[in-house]
């Protein structure tokens, strides 16, 4: 059953609860009338839980290899959430290209923040002193794609079997060691040989495997407020003059910032350009708790006050926002798959994770999407190994997990250390991003992260 992305308007949480209740009623009624069986009678090879970029890329890779798979998504469509953002893909480009068919890769430019500007073979991410405006470093990078999450998911969803309104409840494993049956809150189930959790940083599947305590992300003493905004043509031209796509700023007062484009609808009409920017700062968990119920107006006022210590483009970009402009605030967190108590039972290779579900990391070094897409490529190869009979399923999945945990777990720790150092002016130049740029690396010792959490 192939399906294109399901269009819908964003729904509030209460609407999702009502929708789930309606789904339960419909499935019970259909079962009574003999029109459906709540259990899928034909097992899929792979069930992917979560229609994010990782899960959809994995599904495309499996489909490309002729391996049956189903993607389930708890929301009622791809665009159910109102917030969109963009992500950097650089060293992970080859992995994404290997997963998708040529006709989709040929359209990758269409999901960039500026679809009108071809991606350069060689580019750089410039870091500025956000108070003085002086350049601090220029980080070289090859093929730096800035991809809009919503458009990327829409592209990757094409031709896939995606079933919406499927919120994970539990997973049951057959006694013969061959199957896993995944049950959903609407009363239906799907049986498969492998279940893959790609349901994001706050993964339900991860908590199913590890419990709500060990399976939750670890809160960090840092937070950020994000903005998307349009401006008048003159103001938009002014804000974009430093760099046409992206730049980073480090403020000696202890703030980190990013500024870039999110959507260039018409390159000749700056009033149609949407900018994407944020400021992050050190915030003890006690402070995060104390301000947990702040209104949008309070969050905006807070970040406007912080921006007064910045130079342009940040200062003007914040000053020009109306007082009722929507912002998104969040505390930073991570999940290290290599940490103590984070080792899950894959039940003989019948369940595993990829992407943020397996290794949620901070974003100031721009590694998350690259590791996630690399997971998808390596997991697709592992599935091909056992599906073709070249390896036992348990061995193939365990080998995938061993490599993924070493690679991405090391980056979780590196990225968290990097976040701490970028918010400490005395340590900025020793930070991983300043020392190593955006190239992948592994760091096996988790002790620095423990110290960061104690701050």
Name the predicted role of every residue range:
Residues 81-85, 290-294, 364-367:
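Short, solvent-exposed loop/turn segments at secondary-structure boundaries
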Residues 48-64, 68, 72, 196-197, ...:
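Conserved mid-domain beta->alpha element of the FAD-binding
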Residues 54, 77, 202:
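Conserved Rossmann-like nucleotide-cofactor binding loop
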Residues 16-17, 25, 29-46, 89-230, ...:
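Conserved N-terminal helical subregion
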Residues 5-47, 108, 116-119, 124-133, ...:
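C-terminal helical "tail/cap" subdomain of flavin- and related membrane-associated enzymes
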Residues 58, 81, 173, 205-208, ...:
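Short glycine-/acidic-enriched loop or helix-start segments at secondary-structure transitions
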Residues 157-322:
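Conserved FAD-binding catalytic core of PHBH/FMO-like flavoproteins
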Residues 74-78, 83-87, 92, 97:
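Glycine-rich active-site loop/strand segments that organize a redox cofactor
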